[in-house]
């Protein structure tokens, strides 16, 4: 298992930037790739790389953060696998005013093939569908992330 955190307010560079976690507060021994483990990750790098290591692996990922923005509007966060947004991980909130805070969270079960390697990044999503007219996208605001936690744990099934 690994758990990474962000404590201080961290503005992202754009509305499509990855979230860079600056501190790992829990990391079990099997979550080190140098020990034949299943995860390659370093603090300050947005990419979490999971290795299949010869057997099918199932992983639970959980993300939670307080989000804000310098402007009112929609902020959206999602999980990307090998550069592709996983649709059911997108979470969007509407901030009524600049510097308002809302909580965004998701959990997802992932499968990595036995000989596969997958890279995961949590990032801001640049646009989301308008609820009443889904074909018309809403451009999102640049998020400010604080009190964020992201963890990945390997499961047995």
Model regions: which residues?
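Extracellular jelly-roll beta-sandwich "head" domains, especially the C-terminal globular C1q domain
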Residues: 1-157
């Amino acid at each position: 298992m690994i758990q990474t955190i962000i404590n201080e307010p961290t503005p992202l560079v754009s509305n499509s930037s990855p979230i860079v976690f600056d501190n790992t507060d829990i990391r079990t021994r099997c979550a080190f790739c140098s020990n034949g483990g299943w995860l390659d990750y370093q603090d300050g790098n947005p990419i979490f790389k999971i290795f299949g290591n010869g057997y099918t692996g199932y992983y639970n990922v959980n993300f939670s953060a307080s989000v804000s923005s310098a402007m009112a509007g929609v902020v959206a966060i999602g999980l990307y696998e090998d550069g592709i947004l996983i649709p059911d991980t997108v979470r969007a909130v509407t901030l009524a005013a600049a510097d308002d805070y809302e909580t965004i969270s998701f959990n997802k079960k992932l499968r990595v093939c036995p000989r596969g390697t997958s890279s995961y990044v949590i990032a801001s999503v640049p646009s989301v569908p308008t609820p009443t007219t889904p074909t018309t996208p809403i451009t999102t605001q640049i998020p400010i992330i604080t009190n964020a936690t992201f963890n990945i744990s390997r499961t047995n099934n």
